[in-house]
Amino acid sequence: MLEGLQGIHAPSWIGRSREAVEMGERPLDLLPHQSPQQQPLVRKHPVSGEKSLYICEEKQMDFVDGPIAGLESGPQGAGAKLLRELLRHATRDEFVYVHEWEPGDLVIADNRNLLHCATWYDAAQYTRLMWRTTVMGNPGEEYAGEEKTWIPRDGSDVMAGMENA
């Protein structure tokens, strides 16, 4: 049922999130490489072969044209209902790991099979130092030959045009 469906992902600040659509915000005018990106809802890990959902929270999905391509769009559409059902499933207790941080901890995660989020901490009491690295690699066969539409063709900065965003 899910294989073959495409989620429409969009940055939260461009006015296409569920909340922005419900509040009547006008989506930002974007350069072609900044537009929402369609991604398969089900991806197969290129090493383990394990299938997993590739979804984001409602702030990072496009509710103007989606969030699921080919299904009724908008916050009350069939695509939104399916996304909420998938998020409820993916965040069930048996699928959730909560790290209890200790000084010196290092967490390494494979984002190809991971839905993650930040959690609250007491910034007045604790110092938080986070470093993120991204390892480039093969995201899976679903992307073989994919044109990287989020990279400007003219070599300009990826964030060009976002001065007023």
Regions found by a protein language model. Give the residues of each.
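Non-heme Fe(II) oxygenase catalytic core, chiefly the N-lobe of the double-stranded beta-helix
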Residues: 1-106, 112-165
